Amino acid sequence: VYKVTGSKKFVLDGHVANKLIVVTRTSGNAGDRDGITLVLVDSDAAGVEVTRTIMADSRNASNIEFSGAEGQLLGEEGKGANVLDYTLDAGRILIAAEMLGSVEECFERTVEYLKTREQFGVPIGSFQALKHRAAQMFCEIELSKSVVLEALSALDDDSDQLAEMASLTKAR
């Protein structure tokens, strides 16, 4: 049994989680890979206080305070960094895929608006400046799609370039 003390900020969907995987430092210094330990804590355990935070982007997050909350070891003590690296890379890629879907929906709605909204008796999509903007948006989306699909393939293949691809999806 491990006792966890400290806080975690902006935990996505933390207010609806039954179990919390808490990244803790059990030895070493800040910045060291060794000494990071993963602990599983019940969200309703004594010493756990969850406060929901409404985010501007409509994501649900929470701030979680741990005051001697008891939890169970996940994996090996002090060896959680390798598991954490893979998990965070996968999360970055999957969030990028989610955001790509959202931006594609926005683009489809934009194109529909360009086709239906009229100004001076013609659809505004016939205006050259708006055509250029739509073309630029399309190119950016296609580039992002290419990066996300490549990153998803790297995730499926457990590629050595997974971390690099995850970083690239964040940049796009």
Q: Residue locations for each model-derived region?
A:
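Flexible, small-/acidic-enriched active-site or ligand-binding loops
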Residues: 10, 42-76
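Residue-level preference for beta-strand/loop junctions
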Residues: 16-18, 58, 128, 165
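Structured core elements
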Residues: 3, 20-23, 40, 63-65, ...
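A short core secondary-structure module
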Residues: 5-49
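Residue-level signal for inorganic ion chemistry
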Residues: 6, 39, 64, 103, ...
